[in-house]
A protein has these predicted regions:
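SF2 helicase catalytic motif II
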Residues: 145, 155-173
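Inter-Walker segment of RecA-like/P-loop motor cores
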Residues: 113-151
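Walker A/P-loop
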Residues: 62-80
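Conserved Walker A/P-loop ATP-binding site and its immediately adjacent core
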Residues: 79-112, 145
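Pre-P-loop entry segment of helicase/translocase ATPase cores
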Residues: 2-57
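Residue-level preference for the first positions of well-ordered beta-strands
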Residues: 63-67, 92-94, 137-140
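Conserved coupling segment at the C-terminus of the helicase ATP-binding
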Residues: 18-22, 66-67, 71, 173
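Well-ordered, non-membrane alpha-helical segments in soluble/globular domains
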Residues: 39-54, 81-82, 151-162
């Protein structure tokens, strides 16, 4: 699964997720909800996941992309879900996934863990008015929607790009 996270801040001060809190929440979820066993190696991977996402939050204008390549089954998707559930309200995220079912699952999981509606998925089976997307903290879309919007944007035909890339009045990055 390919995941892209883009984050925008509405304040000039970085508001990242504390790594120790993230690892603790991830370990608790991993063991209690998923009934998996944790290990120091997994916790190290989870720390790196959080640090990578935090780097994007704290360096929003950095042109450098960081790629996460932990092994299969190490919690990349669950880490993304936990991280987004912990995001302060002032930070918006765009997540791009391959399949509509993944988009629905990720948005639903974020909301369930956060205990509030922070995330929505938008795709051909779950259309949400474009103007409502700007107030959505975590937007989950498919690769196809992202590619189509980017293609239309490049040809000045776009109606969705700004809605995908804007959270409140700031740009998602």
């Amino acid at each position: 699964m390919a995941l892209l996270i883009s984050i925008t801040k509405n304040l000039s001060k970085p508001m990242s997720v504390p790594v120790d809190c993230f690892v603790s929440n991830m370990k608790n979820y991993w063991q209690s909800s998923l009934k998996n066993t944790s290990s120091p190696e997994l916790e190290n991977i989870w720390s790196k996941i959080c640090e990578t996402f935090n780097h994007k939050v704290e360096n929003e204008f950095s042109p450098i992309w960081h790629v996460l390549q932990p092994p299969t089954g190490s919690g990349k998707t669950q880490g993304l879900v936990i991280y987004c559930s912990m995001l302060p309200e002032i930070i918006g995220a765009l997540i791009v996934v391959r399949f509509k079912e993944q988009a629905d699952m990720i948005a639903s999981s974020i909301n369930q863990i956060a205990g509030v509606k922070k995330a929505v998925s938008r795709h051909s089976d779950h259309l949400i008015p474009m103007e409502d997307l700007r107030d959505t903290q975590v937007l989950v879309i498919t690769h196809k929607a992202y590619e189509n919007s980017l293609d239309r944007f490049q040809h000045d035909l776009d109606w969705s790009w700004k809605n995908y890339t804007t959270y409140r009045k700031s740009k998602r990055r």
